[in-house]
Amino acid sequence: MAHSRSAKKRIETIRKRTERNKSAKSALKTAIRRFEEAVQGDDKEQAREKLQKALVSIDKGVSKGILHKNTAARRKSRLTKKFNIITG
């Protein structure tokens, strides 16, 4: 356990940031999952909407420091590729 006052503050700060990051990661994963479900259902219009939301979520993840920019680019590329396959 932390002994100094500053170490105790840091533990609390880390806990808060961890919660915030978990929430943001969960929202990101949910957006991606919903897009993939729309792709599985072959609903092109719904997939288009869900793709846009997923891409925005990924970009927000980068700006919040949850994802590395290269990871985000890779995920966006893969999602776009899946969308292009169903739209032919």
Swiss-Prot record:
GO molecular function terms attached to this record: small ribosomal subunit rRNA binding; structural constituent of ribosome
UniProt GO cellular component terms: cytosol; small ribosomal subunit
InterPro entries in alphabetical order: Ribosomal_bS20, Ribosomal_bS20_sf
Keyword hit for rRNA-binding: yes
GO biological process, one term: translation
Pfam family, one: Ribosomal_S20p
Keyword terms of this UniProt record: Ribonucleoprotein, Ribosomal protein, RNA-binding, rRNA-binding
Family statement: Belongs to the bacterial ribosomal protein bS20 family.
HAMAP family: Ribosomal_bS20 (MF_00500)
Described function: Binds directly to 16S ribosomal RNA.
Record-given protein name: Small ribosomal subunit protein bS20
Lineage, top ranks: Bacteria, Bacillati, Bacillota, Clostridia, Thermoanaerobacterales
UniProt gene name: rpsT
